[in-house]
Amino acid sequence: FTSVGKTIFVSRVNKAAIKHQMTLIETNLKDNYSVILFPEGTSSDGLSVLPFKSSLLGVIEKENMKDYSFQPITLSYNKLDGIPIDLKYRPFLAWFGAMDLLSHAWKFLGLGRCEVDLNFHKPIKFREFKDRKTASDHAFKLISGQILRNNNTKKVNKIVKLNEFKIL
């Protein structure tokens, strides 16, 4: 299964593996594959964006990689069965902490039809960034800002308050 998607497994424990993982990213880019990184380093409760880990963006600093592009993408869950999701219900959608993936996925699928927003931000050539930390900060600001706009809870709370519904 992972060979179909060309999955690159990232070790968050073994810092010595970062160089090898960067080489895999570089090789895949040179072979014209897109690489998607989830830079938070772990998952959150969906209420905020965690600080980004910039180490795997180190390919940006390599001179032979300057013509490649970097495109931040925001992924957010905003509606359940067509109804905007109130802030306090977001943790039911997120997989985080010590949650068992299978039982969480089963509960998630039982919630109803969930709408996912994907926002593709402007691609930028690697050469536009001073270093990996600058690229990471740029992506963090774009993504966290978009999450706030997508999760506009003041607007959501005016539309409907899910906690006011009672089961008959």
Which residue stretches match the model-derived regions?
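Cytosolic-facing loops and C-terminal tails of multi-pass membrane proteins
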Residues: 133, 138-168
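Glycine-rich phosphate-binding loop signature in dinucleotide/nucleotide-binding domains
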Residues: 28-32
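A cross-family acyltransferase "interaction/gating" segment
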Residues: 14, 33, 45-130, 134
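Membrane-interfacial amphipathic helices and adjacent loop/beta segments
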Residues: 1-27, 120
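Short helix-loop-beta-strand segments that form the rim/entrance of peptidase-like active sites
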Residues: 7, 33-34
